[in-house]
From Swiss-Prot:
InterPro entries: NAB, NET2A-D/KIP1-like_C, NET2A-D/KIP1-like_dom. PROSITE patterns: NAB. One of its GO terms (cellular component) is membrane. Residues 455-555, 580-620 are annotated as: Disordered. It holds the Pfam family NET2A_C. Keywords: Coiled coil. Residues 525-536 have a biased composition (Polar residues). Disulfide bonds: none annotated. The keyword Ribonucleoprotein does not apply. Plant-specific actin binding protein. May be part of a membrane-cytoskeletal adapter complex. GO terms for molecular function: actin binding. Residues 10-90 form the NAB domain. This is Protein NETWORKED 2D. It comes from Arabidopsis thaliana (Mouse-ear cress).
Amino acid sequence: MLQRAASNAYSWWWASHIRTKQSKWLEQNLQDIEEKVQYVLKLLQEDGDSFAKRAEMYYKKRPELISFVEESYRAYRALAERYDHISTELQNANTTIASVFPDQVPNFAMDDDIDMSKFAKRSNISGANVPNVPKLPVKDLKSAVRVATKKLQPRKSMKYTGGSTNVVVKSSGLSKPEAMGEIDKLQKEILALQTEKEFVKSSYEIGLSKYWEFEKGIKEKQERICGLQDEFGESVAIEDEEARRLMTETAIKSCQEKLVELQEKQEKSYEEAREEHVKIKESKEKLRSMASQFLGDESVFAKDDGDEVRRTAELDHEIKEMSRKKKELESVKEKIREHFESGANSSLNGTDMAEKVDELVNKVISLESAVSSQTALIQRLRNETNGLQTQISTLETDKALLADDKSDLRNKLKEMEEKLKALQDLDRNVLDKSSNLQTHFDDACHNLDNLSGGNLHEVKPESESDNLAISIEPQKDLEGEKRTLDISEEIKEHQKETGEEKKEAPVKSVKFEQTRNATIAEDSTIPSTNPDTVLESTEKVDSDLEKQDASDKTDSVLDNVLENQAASDQTDSVLDSVLEKQGESDKIDSVPSNVSEKESDISFNGEQQEDQKEKEGEPDWKEMFMKGMENREKHLLTEYTTILRNFKDMKKTLDETKTKMKTENATKDDEIKLLREKMSLLQKGLGDSNDLMENQLSNDDYSIGFMAAENQNMSLVEEQFRLNIDELLEENLDFWLRFSTAFGQIQSYDTSIEDLQAEISKLEQRRKQDGSSTAKYALRSDVRPLYVHLREINTDLGLWLEKGAALKEELKSRFESLCNIQDEITKALKSSAEDDDFRFTSYQAAKFQGEVLNMKQENNKVADELQAGLDHITTLQLEVDKTLGKLIDEFALSGSKNKSDLDLQHSDSRSRVPLRSFIFGSKQKRAKPSIFSCMHPSLYRKMKTST
């Protein structure tokens, strides 16, 4: 589903991206066409009053008009191609939608008709005065007529052969009676499939409506949750166990309700099948009586009725079984309700429970489809039975007329006999499917009973067993030991009877042997032993083993605590010895060795503690072997994953310990160096240097101890202020990154604008040097890219101003948050002074106030720089706007962009207008032969183009 949601989100993004590109392309094209049209209208509106204007119009304006026409044709061709492509894609999309949502196909068709009618009206209005082009004549009329006659020949031959009496074998290879029988059979199958299709469609619609109701309810509840969370500012998360339990309960309840509903439908179907079976039996009796009355022959229907009696008995038995299963389902429903009301949690782990529930859901779904198919089959049986009864009643009314014509009566009776056989086969099919459905119902009810009954309490989760093992009380331990002794005596008596008595071992081995012997006795099913008592004793021994293991674990935890306490005492003694022996430099050199010994002792104790934890986390292999290791691979996989997870945790803790020890060693080395320097200075001093050194060391020790106590006794107020300041510092990093990138863009904008202005100044100098009016249009192709680049830079500058405004607002909000922190610091200091507990001292408040003041100063500096950047960008934007207006006025950029197409005016295919006729008008003159007509055509063409 995530993947589907992700793919839907990506497709939406891609569609919006394409739509944006298409809209930009269309907007650009429309803008270009508008500029070209305005320019061409200016050209056409000019008057050629003088000879110079007419010459300019001929040599300069005429090629521009021709290029405009060519570019307009190209643009129209591109639009037509795009329209063709988009219409094809739209048609494919409509086809896909129609295949996925067939109910909405008429709506699409109506929309298409409306659109086509609109386009048809527009086309008729626009092309009202345009004459219709006649169609091309058929070149090969004889061949077309011959092909048409060949196509019509098979129809004529079929008409002629249809009147003949001979039976013609068609391409299917069947005769007419066989074909009629095949058609009848296929029509009946189609009818059955259509009936099943209607039932499936109705169930699908009902399920779809329920699905949307559930979706609506979920949406309303989610909106209610969001509203409550926003109102109170708190959120509640459901635990995994609670969510799993709720989902399991809902799934089991839904399956149980669906099974009851299907059971009722199946019972109703059984009743209907029994009624139809009785009708078939009555119809057979009527046909038999008619045959014996009019034909005196019962051989047609004289068959053993054992099958019908057996089927009737089976149907009655199935109905009784269905009623019994319905009662069982009601009892199971009551068990489920009591189980869920009592709040009993499922003891199966999540994977096993999910697999069992999935299996039950799949069975219920298959049962639902099978019941719908069975209902459709019974509906078909009812229709055909009613048809047969109608025919029998018609035959009974006309039996007086058919009494004389016995052959016709016999044929009709045979036809009804065939229909009766088909009905009996259909009835037998219904019975077989009913028995098969009953088997599936039994299986589903058994699974539901297992999920709601005893299997829910067979396996216990590991966390629950651990918690129970840790929270054992001493009285329960004593009771468990007494119970273990009683069970051991019973098992010894049983061993004496079977001749398998063994020697006693230590406490744990005796318990293991006792449990194993009890399991062997249960498997071998010895007559002298009751299996129930053996099972009870086994469960008791298992619980005692768990309690004994828990007591061992608690003892090991206490041992680890004592070892850690001894290690800490040893560490304190080492540090005291180091501080006492600081008077001599030679003794100071021995401190690293003591520290290394301390570290090795701590690491050794830590390793012992980790080993003990690993032993505690191991599963109870004795209990698993006693229970037979049914899911051996699953247990091994879980054990492997736990070992791997423990290894990763151990590696992580080891790395953390290494880094911690490295830092501690570095600090201790620094302290040792400092002490050596002090020793050297004190040895050079006066004779009372030893006293001074001891005083300084005591002061240092006091300061170090005070700082350590201060770090250890950090109050909640300090932690809260520290968290707030750290959050602001992290936000500072993100803000500085965005601020630096934005300021880096300013330099690039400066350089690009300067370069563009330099290029524009060069072009202006070239235009001034040429001095002619044609130079402006010649330089337009060079100015156009610069104009486009400046427009892009102008857009980017606007975006930068928006980003700068957002950064400015963020700075204001940060300044307000810093002021709020200052107010909170002063309030906390006043409250601590009033309470006289001094958990938050003035020294701590001054420290935090200093940090906040530094952050406020940095914030003000950044705000000043940002304001300067905004002013600079605004100035650049004004300069760019001014330059763009200047380019539009000087170079008349409203014309066409591509002047490279002017070379097309020299093509041979273009008709040319002579200058004399264009200026002075055309005169009727007799054409004279050219002097160059005697030349070679290629040379004549070159000469013509050169002139």
